[in-house]
């Protein structure tokens, strides 16, 4: 079973930990709008940026769904955030071209992306926050308890996209486009035509719609595309080490040993 502490601990893994860094006014104290992320998991560049190119009015990419901006914190007085504009936060920053600058921010000022210059900045501290993994609600109203959104169990969009995939493989591109556009129309995204649709587009649409809900590996595995897509979009360590046989997972040895009526062969490569 689970209790009220399990999910906040899990969801903290997906949240950036900018609140812990002694930069731009943050001091390691969790605030209501920061949560208490530990950044154990960061989405890929493909997920954060690539699939949103030319997305137009797609509400799935709106700032309320994917928060891409960060702001200097308000001052904490007695555990309460106060809009004290007499405070100025001073942070030395070395830009990517080597220029040294001094960033001076008032509470509520935006922390500009060009000031995120270290690997630590972009990998753990200041990557976009997906509100599928967090809301502004906290257990018992305490910001250090993390963010706890409701989780979806069934999604009709998943059904449409599965059928679109089936239509495409059956040669019915018109039916596939219609199903994909049903999902996109709900999201206020621009509609597509048959010339734009292929299996990669359907996978992109699944990512936009079902991030954090579907098991992406299982989707790619049944398509026999784990190797191909990891090589194309995975981070360096994953792309360098993955092998074609990794499209399938190994069969547990206990399952092989317990199958007494016939020989159960291990998947190739394991």
Walk through the language-model features, giving the residues of each:
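Selective for proline/serine-rich intrinsically disordered segments
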Residues: 6, 41, 90, 105, ...
């Amino acid at each position: 079973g689970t209790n009220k502490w399990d999910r906040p601990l899990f969801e903290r893994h997906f949240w950036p930990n900018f609140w812990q860094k002694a930069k731009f006014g943050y001091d390691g104290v969790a605030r209501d709008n920061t949560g208490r992320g530990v950044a154990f998991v960061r989405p890929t560049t493909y997920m954060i940026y690539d699939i949103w190119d030319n997305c137009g009015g797609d509400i799935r990419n709106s700032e309320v769904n994917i928060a891409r901006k960060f702001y200097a914190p308000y001052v904490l007085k007695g555990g309460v955030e106060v809009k004290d504009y007499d405070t100025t936060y001073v942070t030395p920053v070395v830009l990517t071209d080597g220029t040294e600058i001094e960033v001076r921010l008032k509470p509520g000022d935006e922390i500009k992306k060009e000031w995120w210059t270290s690997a630590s900045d972009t990998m753990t501290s200041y990557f976009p926050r997906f509100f599928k993994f967090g809301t502004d609600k906290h257990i018992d109203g305490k910001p250090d308890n993390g963010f706890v959104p409701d989780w979806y169990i069934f999604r009709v969009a998943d059904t449409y996209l599965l059928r679109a995939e089936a239509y495409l493989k059956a040669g019915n591109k018109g039916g596939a486009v219609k199903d994909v556009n049903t999902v996109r129309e709900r999201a206020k995204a621009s509609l597509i035509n048959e010339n734009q649709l292929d299996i990669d587009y359907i996978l992109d649409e699944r990512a936009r719609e079902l991030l954090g809900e579907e098991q992406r590996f299982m989707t790619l595995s049944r398509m026999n595309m784990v190797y191909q897509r990891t090589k194309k979009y995975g981070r360096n360590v994953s792309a360098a080490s993955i092998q074609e046989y990794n499209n399938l997972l190994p069969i547990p040895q206990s399952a092989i040993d317990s199958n007494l009526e016939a020989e159960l062969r291990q998947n190739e490569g394991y």
